[in-house]
Curated annotation (Swiss-Prot):
Required co-factors: Mg(2+); Mn(2+)
UniProt lineage: Bacteria, Bacillati, Actinomycetota, Actinomycetes, Mycobacteriales
The keyword Manganese belongs to this UniProt entry's keyword annotation: yes
EC number(s) recorded for this UniProt protein: 3.1.-.-
Binding sites annotated in the UniProt record for Mn(2+): 155, 220, 235
Gene label: cas1
Name of the molecule in the record: CRISPR-associated endonuclease Cas1
Length: 338
């Protein structure tokens, strides 16, 4: 099962004979068996036929809608029919500080390890030793954290060191000097922000398919409109799925700084239509590729399949109350771009 990403060059999407039919003046017609699709993400304003929408809803496949320049608009999905006992257990676990802290430690530890693996995979002579040392120091203190506040402090220190290291890897013309959001202030931040948005929406859909509530998390604090559980789960995926993809787009010359524009009033930097297409296409290709994602499991999976394994393990963790049983998303044994 894969998530299909459709660029704004597409003008019509229809359904016939068990296949989703995508047509554009640029590429002509493409067909995809609907049973192979986990969902569809659309950019721009293509015409969608009623049979296509009905079939997607009947099969509980989400349709996510983004503007041409990558801003999320909403989604078309079936009503949430979550399993009530599971939701009660989820809420019950969030009221247990020890459970939340233990689960959050596993997430943060793996996030830092995956960030270190990404830096090492992309380093070719750059001086990132100090950043790696800082990340290792923070990692050593994660398990000693006595509260979520302490844990967030160590995670923040590691994140600062990680983005400092990324600053040595990103070409100078991209003017990347650290993470900036709302708005992104340089081309690199603009690309990863778009990627994180695509990843976040993808994970929300996966959470709901497993009858959990995406807005009830364990690591991130509640805030209106924030799917905190999606943010929790995506922490371990940011580096291998998004950051790696963006670094490779730059290294391969697929995008350059000419593909971005800056708002003179706000300083915000946004990708052009063509750059947004390239990023969305690269993200779609990345999550369709197989890799060894699960610690202790030599099998290669697509991102979507590995995400389902992660969520299945989270359901078991919630039901049994044992955070140590959460599947460990480990990219340290295989560079994420492999």
């Amino acid at each position: 099962m894969v998530q299909l990403y459709v660029s704004d060059s597409v003008s019509r999407i229809s359904f016939a004979d068990g296949r989703v039919i995508v047509w554009s003046e640029e590429l002509g017609e493409s067909q995809y068996p609907i049973e192979t699709l986990d969902g569809i993400t659309l950019f721009g304003r293509p015409t969608m036929t009623t049979p296509f929408i009905v079939e997607m809803l009947k099969r509980e496949r989400d349709i996510q809608l983004f503007t041409t320049d990558g801003h999320y608009q909403g989604r078309i999905s079936t009503p949430d029919v979550s399993y009530a006992p599971r939701l009660r257990q989820q809420v019950h676990r969030t009221d247990d500080p020890a459970f939340c802290l233990s689960l959050s430690k596993r997430i943060v530890s793996r996030k830092i390890l995956n960030q270190q693996a990404l830096i090492r995979a992309h380093t070719s002579g750059q001086d990132v030793a100090e950043s790696i040392r800082t990340m290792k120091h923070s990692l050593a203190w994660v398990d000693r954290s006595g509260s979520l506040a302490e844990l967030n402090g160590f995670e923040g220190n590691a994140a600062k060191a990680y983005f400092t290291a990324l600053g040595h890897l990103v070409p100078q013309e991209f003017a990347f000097q650290g993470r900036s959001t709302r708005p992104p202030l340089d081309a690199f931040n603009s690309m990863v922000s778009l990627g994180y948005s695509l990843l976040y929406k993808n994970i929300i859909g996966a959470i709901e398919r497993h009858s959990l509530n995406a807005y009830i998390g364990f690591l991130h604090q509640d805030s209106r409109g924030h799917a905190t559980l999606a943010s929790d789960l995506m922490e371990v995926w940011r580096a291998p799925i998004i950051d790696d993809t963006v670094l490779r787009l730059i290294a391969d010359g697929v995008v350059d700084t000419r593909a971005f524009s800056k708002n003179s009033d706000t300083g915000a930097v946004f990708a052009t239509r063509e750059a947004t297409r390239s990023i969305a296409r690269a993200f779609g290709n990345r999550i369709a590729r197989t890799a060894t994602y699960i610690k202790g499991d030599p099998h290669r999976y697509t991102f979507q399949y590995a995400l389902d394994l992660q969520l299945q393990s989270l359901v078991r963790v919630i039901e049994a109350g044992h955070p140590s049983r959460l599947v460990d998303i480990d990219i340290t044994s295989e560079p994420s771009g492999a």
